[in-house]
Amino acid sequence: MENIDIEKAPVISEGNKEKKGLKKWMCAKSSKFRSWWDDKRHKMDKWSRETPFRRKMWLNKTLYMMMIPYMVLFFLFTVVPVVMSFLLSFSYFNLLEAPRFIGWANYLALFLDDPIFITSIKNTLIIALITGPLGYLLSFVFAWLINELPNKLRAFITLVFYAPSISGSALAIWTLIFASDIYGYANSFLINWGLIREPITWLQDSAYILPIVIVVQLWMSLGVNFLTLIAGLKGVDRSQYEAGAVDGVKNRWQELWYITLPNMKPQLLFSAVLQISGSLGVGAITTALAGFPSVNYAGHTIVNHLQDYGTTRYEMGYASAIATLLFISAIILNKLIRKIIGRVGS
């Protein structure tokens, strides 16, 4: 665009000649500006019409501008660490020396020379296969039932379900329940009822550690998932049930499958992702209950193995290989869950 030089503008005087000259000069500059702007707008419109993606970007350019800070932070604190972890998994790196490329040696060592890692895979799969589907199902059933209650009672029960997931002392309650002396609630109950004579060392016996971890993880996972699903249930338009009754929906099960579930797919997917990440990421619970490492590695999970090599032994290349395998497993499960939830209501 040509800059408008104010100093070259005709001086306004009382004479008609000077006034006409100023008007002619301003019209010429305005015409040039309109021509320049029309040309720029035509180019931008042409660029935005080339592909559907560009068209959407142009129409929602303000929203994309607002997303830039988040995308920058996401790239720096999520994408970059994942890529760096993947690259380090092919190296030997102990924080004291520069990374040294060793190819697939870390991955081969995990599966061929590390029996504790195989144990951690087995324990993680057992926990995930039990707490994942069961926790997801229980969260939905409880949310579905409680959603029918009066508002005040529903709010109170929602708080009861959600409070343990945000309470830092929740795990301490379970250590009291499964304490190894006669003062533990579980031992006290069993002794008083004559079921046992001597207290059971729940958290020091490898036969009980994994079942206890499963129970605690299942209990801890209900809070956020329950809150997410009950929010989805509240968002379903009640008029759709009336329309469904006109279209032939005859009972509550048909309402659930054809109306309720299809209208809360975002909440179902979000809850499933939380459940998967929580089931695969079990580590803090086993450490808090059974110590690190647990007796005979009975509660040892992939996350515990990652912590062992990453924060205790500082073998960062080996730990990065573990983290990469865990990340890939989570991605595969998330893709599978998306396909399953996508068929809901069909």
Annotate each predicted stretch with a short phrase.
Residues 1-66, 151-154, 336-346:
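Transmembrane alpha-helical segments of polytopic membrane transport and secretion proteins
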Residues 56-346:
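A structural signal for multi-pass alpha-helical bundles of membrane permease subunits
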